[in-house]
């Protein structure tokens, strides 16, 4: 069985939890891999997704925010977070994780903290594999 753990980052609580589950599966002889958007460590078994696209997207949005232009929902939510001290997230992203070779090769997908990484609207329509989603907080149903 091939299991793919998807997490926005391999740092922080959910990322570390994903790594612990990944390591436990490897010890049991399960073919386990980890796919992240933001890679915080130098482990070879953690694969970073499309770094250049993320860098370009963040740079463009940073410039738009500096010009006080809320052209995208991402910029609106970012400004809302800064101005209110709250932490809201969006269920859509620019990333199409469903087409990644690791997703296509996996038998089971294990989602951890996927804020800003998984585009809910397209991912669940395109991926027709068993999905396990570990909820580390209320983001899934509240967006915070």
Language-model regions: role of each:
Residues 1-53, 104, 127:
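N-terminal subdomain of nucleotide-sugar transferases
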Residues 6, 13, 17, 109-121:
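Conserved beta-strand->loop/alpha-helix structural units within folded catalytic cores of enzymes
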Residues 8, 38, 113-114, 137:
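Short, well-ordered beta-to-alpha junction loops that form the rim of enzyme active sites
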Residues 12-14, 41-45, 117-120, 139-144:
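Short catalytic/ligand-binding loop motif for oxyanion handling, primarily in non-cytosolic enzymes
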Residues 16, 20, 24, 28, ...:
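Metal-centered catalytic cores of metalloenzymes
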Residues 41-72:
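Conserved nucleotide-sugar phosphate-binding/catalytic loop shared by glycosyltransferases and other
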Residues 65-117:
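Conserved nucleotide-sugar donor-binding subdomain of glycosyltransferases
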Residues 107-110, 124-144:
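Active-site proximal beta-strand in glycosyltransferases
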């Amino acid at each position: 069985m091939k299991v793919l753990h998807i997490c926005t980052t391999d740092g922080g609580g959910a990322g570390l939890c994903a790594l612990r589950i990944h390591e436990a599966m490897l010890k049991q002889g399960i073919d386990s891999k980890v796919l992240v958007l933001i890679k915080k460590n130098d482990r070879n078994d953690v694969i970073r997704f499309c770094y250049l696209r993320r860098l370009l997207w963040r740079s463009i949005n940073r410039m738009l925010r500096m010009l006080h232009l809320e052209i995208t929902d991402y910029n609106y939510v970012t400004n809302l977070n800064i101005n209110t001290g709250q932490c809201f997230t969006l269920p859509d992203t620019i990333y199409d994780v469903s087409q990644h070779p690791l997703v296509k090769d996996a038998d089971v997908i294990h989602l951890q903290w996927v804020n800003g990484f998984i585009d809910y609207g397209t991912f669940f329509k395109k991926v027709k594999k068993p999905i396990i989603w570990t909820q580390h907080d209320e983001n899934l149903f509240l967006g915070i």
